[in-house]
């Protein structure tokens, strides 16, 4: 059900992906919620693909990740950036799509934030690790306390 692969992308290629996404000129956009309108969290987001369209000039940067997943059809590709907090706490269980597809989370940097599934399984945020699971499996990210930011690439696909 949940599959985990470490060093998912060739390490030399991953260095470039990380450098681009975590670079000071990468366009992140403030989002006043994390899970749903009115929650107490915020994050910065970047849509690479949404509503059947490539929405970012940076799509080519993450294309090798998409190719390696053997995607037949994309639903959404989004980068999430959260900032350091004073204690680790979950954001809230949720699903990313209102229908059954696949979800993959690629961790762009290592930090002490985790992904928790409704099954109780916990996945550490370690760079270049990917976790793949059915989109109807509820999950939550958490805050982190050790790095300035936590960055993940969230991919929903068939």
Locate the predicted segments by residue:
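A short glycine-rich, His/Asp/Glu-containing loop-to-beta-strand
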Residues: 67-86
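Conserved metal-binding segment of the jelly-roll/cupin
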Residues: 84, 123-140
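Non-heme Fe(II)/2-oxoglutarate
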Residues: 1-72
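A short beta-strand-loop-beta hairpin characteristic of the jelly-roll/cupin
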Residues: 87-92, 99-101, 107-126
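Short beta-strand His + acidic residue motifs that chelate non-heme Fe in jelly-roll/DSBH
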Residues: 92-94, 138-146
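A short hydrophobic beta-strand segment most commonly corresponding to one strand
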Residues: 104-106, 147-158
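Short beta-strand segments enriched in hydrophobic/aromatic residues
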Residues: 81-83, 108, 157
């Amino acid at each position: 059900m949940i599959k985990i692969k470490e060093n998912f992308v060739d390490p030399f290629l991953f260095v470039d992906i990380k450098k681009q996404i975590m670079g000071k000129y990468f366009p992140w956009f403030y989002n006043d919620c994390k899970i749903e309108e009115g929650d107490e969290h915020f994050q910065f987001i970047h849509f690479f693909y949404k509503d059947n369209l490539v929405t970012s000039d940076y799509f080519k940067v993450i294309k090798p990740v998409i190719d390696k997943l053997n995607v037949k059809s994309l639903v959404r590709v989004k980068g999430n950036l959260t900032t350091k907090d004073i204690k680790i706490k979950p954001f809230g269980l949720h699903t990313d799509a209102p229908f059954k597809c696949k979800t993959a989370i690629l961790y762009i940097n290592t930090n002490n934030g985790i992904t928790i599934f409704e099954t109780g399984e916990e996945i550490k945020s370690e760079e270049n690790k990917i976790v793949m699971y059915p989109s109807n499996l509820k999950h939550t990210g958490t805050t982190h306390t050790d790095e300035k930011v936590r960055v993940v690439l969230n991919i929903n696909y068939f």
